[in-house]
C-alpha cells in the first residue's frame, strides 16, 4: 500500500512531538539539572537510573495493553489523541524550577520526570507500533521512517536553537524561567503535532493478536533471536547517544571554552548532520544493503570518535565542529533502518514460532531503549562526579579530560559493539521478502 506524502508527514509529526522530549533529555536535561536547577551531578545520575528503570519495567505492560484494546479509530491511533494534552502539560512541569530546599527540589525533579516518562510511554509505544499497520510494504515503511526521522531532526533544531534563544528572550536574564516558558511552548507544540498525526494517518491492516498470557508471549518472544539482537543494539546505541549527547553542552561550554554562547551552535551542528544522514539513508538504501550500511556506519563512528579524542585540543574549535558533524552524520544513518526493522523482526518471529507477538515486541524494544538511557545517565552522573565536575566554575584538567572522554572514546566503544553485533542480524531485503511470502501462504 502506497502512502501519500500527507500521511507520511502526519506520521512523522508524531515522532517530531516525541523528540521534543527525547532530544531535550539527551542534549539538555543533564545540563539543565546541574547548571540551571542546581542539582549535583551524582544526584542527577541516580535520578536518571531510577526513573528509567521504573519506566522500562512499565513498557512491556503498555505494549500488551495496546494489543488488547481496539476502537473504531484503530488499535494504536487513539492513544495519540488521548494523551496529547497530558504530554504537553508534563513537558512543561518537568522544566519548572521551584525555589525550595535542596531535597524538595530533588523530589520535584523525581516526580515530574517520572510523570513525563509515564506519559511518554503511553503515547510512544502505540506510535511506534503504527508502522506495522499503516502499510505492509517494507519500502513504504522505510520511506515513512525517512520522513519521520527528518521531522525528528526538525524537533532537534527547535530544542537546540529555538529553546536556548527563547530561554534568553523570555527569561530576561532568568535562565530558569526562560527554560520553563520555552519548553512549555515546545510541549504545546508537541500536543498539536500528536493530534495532527492522529487526524492524518489510518490503520489499514489488522494483525492477528494473540490471546495468550503475557508470560507465554514472553517465552515466544525470547525465541525470536533477531528481535533480541535489535533489543541489545538499541540498548548499546542509547548508551553511546546519551553519553555523547548529554556531555556535548559541557564540551562546548568548558572543554572548548566557549561558554553558554557556544552550546547552541555546537549542538545544532550535530542536528544538521543528523538531518542530512536521514536524507542520505533514504537514497543509499535504494542501492546498498541496509544492514551492511547499518553495520559499517557504526564502525566508522567508532573510528571518528577515537580520532576526535586524539586530534582535537581545546583550541581546535573548527576541528571539533567538523568531527562532531561527521560523528553525528555516520552514527544517525542507522535510524530509519533500525525502526523499520522492528516490524520486520515481528514478522520473522511469527514465521519462526507460528505466533505473532507485536505489542510486547514493540514495548520490549522501548524497554531496552530506556534501560540503555538509564545506564547511560548513571554513567554520565558517575563520571562527572568522579572527574570532579563543578557547575559554572573553571574546570580542572582532570574534569576536562573526563568531559573529552565522555564525548569521544567512551561512546565510541558502544558504537563498535553495535557494529560487531549487527553482523548477526539476518533480515535484509531478500530475507524479508521470503518471510512475507511464507506468511502470505500461511494466511491463504
Regions found by a protein language model. Give the residues of each.
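Membrane-embedded alpha-helical bundles of multi-pass transporters/translocases
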Residues: 1-444
Amino acid at each position: 500500500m502506497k502512502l501519500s506524502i500527507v500521511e507520511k508527514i502526519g506520521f512523522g509529526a508524531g515522532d517530531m512531538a516525541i523528540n521534543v522530549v527525547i532530544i531535550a533529555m539527551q542534549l539538555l536535561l543533564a545540563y539543565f539539572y546541574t547548571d540551571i536547577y542546581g542539582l549535583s551531578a551524582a544526584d542527577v545520575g541516580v535520578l536518571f537510573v531510577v526513573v528509567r528503570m521504573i519506566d522500562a519495567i512499565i513498557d512491556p505492560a503498555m505494549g500488551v495493553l495496546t494489543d488488547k484494546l481496539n476502537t473504531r479509530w484503530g488499535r494504536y491511533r487513539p492513544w495519540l489523541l488521548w494523551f496529547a494534552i497530558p504530554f504537553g502539560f508534563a513537558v512543561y512541569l518537568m522544566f519548572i524550577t521551584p525555589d525550595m530546599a535542596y531535597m524538595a527540589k530533588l523530589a520535584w525533579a523525581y516526580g515530574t520526570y517520572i510523570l513525563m516518562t509515564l506519559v511518554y510511554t503511553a503515547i510512544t509505544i502505540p506510535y511506534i507500533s503504527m508502522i506495522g499497520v499503516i502499510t505492509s510494504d517494507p519500502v513504504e515503511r522505510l520511506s515513512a521512517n525517512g520522513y519521520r526521522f527528518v521531522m525528528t531532526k526538525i524537533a532537534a533544531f527547535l530544542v537546540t536553537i529555538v529553546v536556548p534563544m527563547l530561554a534568553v528572550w523570555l527569561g530576561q536574564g532568568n535562565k530558569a524561567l526562560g527554560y520553563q516558558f520555552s519548553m512549555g511552548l515546545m510541549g504545546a507544540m508537541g500536543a498539536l503535532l500528536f493530534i495532527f498525526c492522529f487526524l492524518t494517518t489510518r490503520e489499514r491492516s489488522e494483525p492477528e493478536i494473540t490471546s495468550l498470557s503475557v508470560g507465554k508471549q514472553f517465552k515466544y518472544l525470547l525465541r525470536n533471536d533477531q528481535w533480541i539482537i535489535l533489543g541489545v543494539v538499541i540498548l548499546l546505541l542509547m548508551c553511546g547517544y546519551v553519553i555523547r549527547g548529554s556531555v556535548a553542552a559541557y564540551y562546548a561550554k568548558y572543554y572548548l571554552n566557549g561558554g553558554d554562547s557556544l552550546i547552541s551552535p555546537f549542538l545544532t551542528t550535530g542536528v544538521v548532520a543528523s538531518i542530512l544522514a536521514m536524507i542520505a539513508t533514504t537514497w543509499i538504501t535504494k542501492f546498498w544493503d541496509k544492514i551492511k550500511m547499518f553495520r559499517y556506519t557504526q564502525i566508522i563512528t567508532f573510528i571518528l570518535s577515537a580520532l576526535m579524542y586524539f586530534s582535537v585540543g581545546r583550541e581546535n574549535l573548527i576541528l571539533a565542529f567538523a568531527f562532531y558533524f561527521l560523528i553525528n552524520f555516520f552514527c544517525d544513518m542507522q535510524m530509519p533502518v533500525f525502526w523499520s526493522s522492528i516490524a520486520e523482526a515481528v514478522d520473522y518471529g511469527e514465521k519462526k514460532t507460528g505466533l505473532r507477538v507485536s505489542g510486547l515486541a514493540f514495548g520490549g524494544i522501548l524497554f531496552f531503549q530506556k534501560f540503555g538511557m538509564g545506564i547511560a545517565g548513571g554513567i554520565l552522573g558517575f563520571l562527572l562526579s568522579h572527574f570532579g565536575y563543578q557547575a559554572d566554575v573553571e574546570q580542572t584538567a582532570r574534569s576536562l579530560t573526563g568531559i573529552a572522554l565522555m564525548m569521544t572514546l567512551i561512546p565510541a566503544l558502544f558504537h563498535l559493539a553495535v557494529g560487531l553485533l549487527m553482523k548477526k542480524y539476518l533480515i535484509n531485503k531478500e530475507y524479508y521478502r521470503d518471510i512475507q511470502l511464507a506468511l502470505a501462504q500461511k494466511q491463504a
